[in-house]
Structures are given as C-alpha cells and as structure tokens.
Amino acid sequence: MKTSLTLGGLLLGGTAIFLGQFQATAVPGGGDGGTASVGPDVIVGAIPDVARYAPGTYQGVEYASYAFGSTSCNIGTAQLQWQPNPSNLHPTIPQNLYRIKSGVIEQIGMSWCKHGFCALQQTLCGACTPAGSGCPTVLGIGCSDPYTASLNGAQSDLKGRGPINPSTGIFSGTYTDPAAPAGLPTSLRERVMVKRSDLDPAQNAGATYVSECAYIHQQDASGNNATNNASYRLVTVGATWSTTQGYPLTLTGPTVQQLPAIFAWQASAPNDVGVKSYDVIGDGRFLLGYRVIDNGNGTWSYEYAIQNLNSDRAGGSFSVPVPAGVTVTNIGFKSPAYMNGEGYSNAAWTATQADGLITWTCEPNTNANANALRWSTLYNFRFTADVPPQTNLGVVNMGLWKAPTATSTATSVQMGARIPSVPTPPNTPGDFDGNGVVDGADLATLLNGWGAAAGDLNGDATTNGADLAILLNNWG
C-alpha cells in the first residue's frame, strides 16, 4: 500500500475508488480515439471521490476547501516513471472547480499540484501489464493508479504550480514553495479554495459544478501525448453549510475522460456553445469556448472563455472585432484568484475599444507576476452588443504573454468564434429595392404605383405628389 495513507484512509479510499472505477467513460475529442498512444501516455481515468476540510475566513471573505481524487491510467505503449521527490520523474496533478451559471462557465477554485510518489498497478482502463508488485515507482502499460481525495488534499505532497513547465513537464524536484500569506487559515491553503458565495445554493440557483483533474509528466510530454491529460466530472452542492466542513459536494455521472472542463460547458448547451482547441508550436494547447445569448431586448451577450490546458507561454491579450456602428456595453473580465502566496497578481485585464476591436490586455511579461492566463486556468471575456452575431465564425486573436523562443516563435494565436455582425443600415424612404441608394429604379417603382398604395411613403395609403417629393429629397 502507499505509505502516505493510514489504514483507515486506505480502506475508505479504496471503497470510493472501487465505486469511481465504474463511473468513467472515454469520450473522443482530445484523446486517442480508443487506440493506444505510442510511448507513455497518462490520462485521468476517473475522479472517484471528494474530500472537504474546515472552512475559514480570509481577507473578510468566507471560503470552503476541497480536494478531488484522481485515478491515472497509462494508455500508452511504454511504462511511466513515478519516482518520488527529489526526482522530477513523476506526475504533478492540479485540481480545479468550475461553475456553469446563467449559461456561462467560470473557474471558481484551484489547488496546488499533488506530486506522485509511487504507482499501484490496477485495471481501471483495461488490461494491465504491471511494472512490479505493491506500489513501484513505475506505472505499467495499461495500468491505473488511484490517488484518493484525502491523498490529493494532503498538504505535505502539494506544491506550487509556478515552477512547473506544463508544456515539457519539467520542474525541479526540490523547488521551494512560497510562504503562506498572513491570515490565510491552514485548512484552506494549497487545496481547492472556493468562496462560500460561489457555492451557496440560494445564490446559485440552477448552477452546475464541474471538477477537473490533470496529470503533467515529462515523459508524456516528450512523447507528444500531453493534450489528453485532463478529465472532468460533474458535482452537486448540498444545501447545508457546515462550520467544520463547508458545503458537501457530491460527484455525479461519469468521469469524462481526456476532455478538460470547458467541454462541460459545451455539453450543457450543445447547440449554443462552441469549443475548439489551438496548439502553439513548441509550447502547449489553449481551448476557446464561445456563446452568444439573445437577451430579448435588442441586445446580445457575447461570452468567451479561454482555457490554458498546458501552455507555458500563457495568454496575455484577447481581441474581438466589432464593426463600426455597433454599440457595446457591459465589457467584463473574470479570472480565478491566486491566494496561496504565489505572488501572482489578481488584477483584472485592461479593456479598451479602438480601431474596430475590443481588446483585453494583461500587464507585460516585464512583471513576472502579472495575471497572465497561466496553465490549468480558465479566463472569461464578455460584452453586450446591439447586433446579433454574424452567420459565419469570425477571427478573434489571443496574444501570447511570454516572449517567443527558438522553438516557439508565434506571438499570437488566431481563433474562430462568433462575433458581432455589421449593423443593418436604416431604410431610406424611397429606396424600394433596398440597395442603399434612391435612384431611377426606385422612381419607376413609385410611378408604377401612382394612385394606389404600392408606392406610398407617407402612410396615407395612396401614391401621389407628396410621396414623389419624399423620394426626390432622398435621391442619391
């Protein structure tokens, strides 16, 4: 058994893992389509259980604290190293929580990274060729390894995300974590820390919650198998707040393997939400989700969510084209908060409207702690416009935050999304054929309707000299 588990924790966790193994389903789209990858390929096969911890108050806000279990599977053709610290030949495992509310997904919590230390050789994802007996420091081909929620929430094995390069999986096995900020309760630190108000059923009627785990591993990355490493599972929130454990969370439905949480947004409204992945050469993957909501009052809400799956270069700007004549209001931005002493800023990106674009911009990379769109996070960009979206997808642009390198030279990523349409010009009285010009063709239409209602412009139900005067006044 894993030495970090007590016997009681192992028995309870084993029951949860057993149940969770039958709550996993493979879904194509970012995965391997059911075929084995060449080389080692680690995925999240199941999110089997959840642990909750004592809530607390930080900077005047009440928070709950959670951890999610994760069962890894090696679906590749080679073994995966699972060496404990100080070696860096093991996976790191971030955990996240999202909320889908009023048709929009937002990230509301994130943990530090659990560091793997050994791997059981189980069979969640199929036939297993064990790498050894017990809990060896290698995960065999086809084998699975369960980490319970209590294990993933153990602060002794949680370390900051910052020193990890998610696109290569490389980090120092001896890196030092930042000091805890003053006043942050110990029970909250390093775990999935969530505002009570973001979970309160009275304030979140109809909301859906989404848990997510991912595995980052340098062997997986070097084998080009790193784009299927996140999986999600839906969560429900109980009605009663506990002063010792916060709100109860219950995992529901299957674990959706090899798809990050942004796909839960699409699954919640498949006819309205689009999601597409974009790979940065020499770096990692971003996913853009978009939705346009008709407000029923002559305005439309444009919602964009970008999830950084495993890009080290991060996102630093986002631009959406807006045609001339469109009235834009309610420009907004949302990002999850860093609160564990990482030093990262939580400042909102600056929004500007100029040169036919709405652009949100992060501080430049001269500030190493700027609020860039870092890996395993999801940021939101939104506005309201007085025109519907154009029929075809338009081009939006995400700028990369870190400078180009010799192997990753791009400075931005073009993406497809729904964008505002060109406003319909107002109808000019006398322009019968709607071509935007009052000309001879329109005059002929009016004259052909003389004495009848066909050429009427002033609403008196007959075509006469008054209508002709209106047409001639708008000539050209």
How should each PLM-predicted stretch be described?
Residues 1-32:
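Sec-dependent, cleavable N-terminal signal peptides
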Residues 30-31, 35-238:
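Solvent-exposed N-terminal domain segments of exported/luminal and surface proteins
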Residues 32, 219-274, 410-423:
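Short beta-strand elements
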Residues 183-203, 361-394, 400-405:
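Low-complexity, intrinsically disordered segments enriched in Ser/Thr together with acidic residues
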Residues 214-216, 384, 401, 474:
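Beta-strand-rich extracellular modules
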Residues 292-312:
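Short beta-strand elements of extracellular/lumenal beta-sandwich folds
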Residues 317-346:
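Solvent-exposed beta-hairpin/edge-strand motifs
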Residues 432-454, 460-476:
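Alpha-helical segments with a strong preference for the paired helices of cellulosomal dockerin domains
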